[in-house]
């Protein structure tokens, strides 16, 4: 339930769990804020869940109430170890893991190592890890997360089941933000949500963080204008005027308008990005007029 917009991965995991073919190592890749670490924790819960009655097996729908689920959720499970490779890149840190791998899990079904930003490990650290990945003990599982999959050696990747977490689709993101806003009892305009969705570029974490800022910025209903100001975007009406001048070939007026927007505090880079968005929107609407009604592609 914590995973938004990752149906293909959930389906693959469910099939693997049901067939009792759980990989020894997983690697999650995707842009920031798509749920890599969340997924890693859910998989860890699923592998060690014993169900509310204490007799359940591995599942893709962990109960969330058994001792293992609760301990993993609170980050205090003795058999589920999380390590941030960004701050512990050396071979000594990995050796520590390798030495502890031989010992069985203290209380859970599996001993699980979650290594975040795994691409930050040094070459020597990867080499040390490789031997364990080649011949892992039955009771050990590795879950790696990375935003830079190209920096992970092929020898490591070939021993992992890989999941590419997609950018979250705009309509899914808007539905998520509406749900959060309703839970917070916050009023926020639909076009304001569309602006936040575009700015987040498919990252749920960025979107929820921007939504928090927008709600605290707005008194009463948060409008698109308030969100635009918060994001440092140029005034949309003035961008449309500028676009019209460019289309007319009126260079003098366009440069004068751009200078005026700059004087009023608009970031020239943001203006150019907005112009590119308007150009894209006009092109899309010319080809598929119905797109004009879609809030996620509006100018």
Mark where each language-model region is.
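P-loop/Walker A NTP-binding region and its immediately flanking N-terminal helices
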Residues: 1-162, 172
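Extended, largely alpha-helical regulatory/partner-binding modules appended to the mid-to-C-terminal parts
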Residues: 9, 34, 67, 71-78, ...
């Amino acid at each position: 339930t914590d995973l938004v917009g990752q149906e293909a991965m959930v389906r693959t995991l469910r099939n693997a769990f049901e067939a009792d073919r759980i990989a020894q190592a997983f690697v999650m890749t995707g842009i920031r804020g798509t749920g890599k670490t969340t997924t890693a924790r859910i998989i860890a819960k699923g592998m060690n869940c014993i169900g509310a009655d204490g007799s359940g097996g591995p599942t893709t729908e962990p109960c969330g109430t058994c001792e293992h689920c609760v301990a993993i959720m609170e980050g205090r499970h003795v058999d589920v170890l999380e390590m941030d490779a960004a701050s512990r890149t050396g071979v000594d840190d990995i050796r520590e893991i390798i030495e502890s791998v031989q010992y069985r899990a203290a209380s859970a079904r599996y001993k699980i190592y979650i290594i975040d930003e795994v691409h930050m490990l040094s070459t020597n650290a990867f080499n040390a890890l490789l031997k364990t990945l080649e011949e892992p003990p039955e009771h050990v599982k590795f879950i790696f997360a990375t935003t830079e999959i190209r920096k992970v050696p092929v020898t490591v990747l070939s021993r992992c089941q890989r999941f590419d977490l997609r950018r979250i689709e705009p309509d899914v993101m808007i539905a998520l933000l509406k749900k959060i806003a309703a839970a917070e009892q916050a009023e926020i305009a639909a076009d304001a949500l569309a602006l936040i969705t575009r700015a987040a570029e498919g990252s749920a974490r960025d979107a929820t963080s921007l939504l928090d800022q927008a709600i605290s910025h707005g008194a009463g209903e948060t409008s698109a204008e308030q969100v635009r100001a918060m994001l440092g975007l140029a005034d949309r009406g003035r961008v449309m005027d500028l676009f019209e001048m460019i289309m007319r070939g009126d260079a003098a007026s366009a440069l004068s308008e751009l200078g005026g927007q700059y004087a009023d505090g608009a970031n020239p880079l943001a203006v150019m990005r907005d112009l590119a968005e308007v150009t894209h929107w006009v092109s899309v609407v010319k080809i598929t007029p119905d797109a004009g009604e879609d809030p996620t592609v509006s100018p």
